[in-house]
């Protein structure tokens, strides 16, 4: 079970976007996350009249490593760590500071 999943609210704890918050759009296999509005890079694209792509300089989100982000606990308004608990035979994610379920 992954500690950070899609649609989790995270906060960046290291790097150029340190302190910024965002929502996880995609989780990649090599411990990387694509976060909405963070770690923006500029990509130069060629125009392609066949598919209707105009071309030019496009800003898009690049993946961040999972070690540079922490899950955001809206109850405490701080970054938090994730632990696991077994309730009713199911493994659930909990915040380490409050022991409350992440998905609740």
UniProtKB/Swiss-Prot annotation:
Protein's GO biological process = translation
Give the matching SUPFAM superfamilies: Translation proteins SH3-like domain
Gene Ontology molecular-function annotations = rRNA binding; structural constituent of ribosome
CC annotations in GO: ribonucleoprotein complex; ribosome
Instruction: Note the SMART domains from the entry.
Output: KOW
Pfam families hit by this protein: KOW (PF00467), ribosomal_L24 (PF17136)
Could you tell me the keywords of this UniProt record?
Ribonucleoprotein, Ribosomal protein, RNA-binding, rRNA-binding
**Complex and partners:** Part of the 50S ribosomal subunit.
- Which family is annotated? Belongs to the universal ribosomal protein uL24 family.
Q: Any idea what job this protein has?
A: One of two assembly initiator proteins, it binds directly to the 5'-end of the 23S rRNA, where it nucleates assembly of the 50S subunit.
PANTHER family of this UniProt entry?
MITOCHONDRIAL RIBOSOMAL PROTEIN L24
Q: What is this protein called?
A: Large ribosomal subunit protein uL24
List the source organism: Pseudomonas fluorescens (strain ATCC BAA-477 / NRRL B-23932 / Pf-5)
| Organism placement in taxonomy | Bacteria, Pseudomonadati, Pseudomonadota, Gammaproteobacteria, Pseudomonadales
């Amino acid at each position: 079970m992954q500690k950070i999943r899609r649609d989790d609210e995270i906060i960046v704890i290291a790097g150029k976007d340190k302190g910024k918050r965002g929502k996880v759009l995609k989780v990649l296999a090599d411990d990387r996350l694509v976060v909405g509005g963070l770690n923006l890079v500029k990509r130069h694209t060629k125009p392609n009249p066949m598919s209707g792509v105009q071309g030019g300089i496009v800003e898009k989100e690049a993946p961040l490593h999972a070690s540079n982000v922490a899950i955001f606990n809206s109850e405490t308004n701080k970054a938090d760590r994730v632990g696991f608990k077994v309730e009713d035979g199911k493994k659930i994610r909990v915040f380490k500071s409050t022991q409350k379920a992440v998905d609740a």
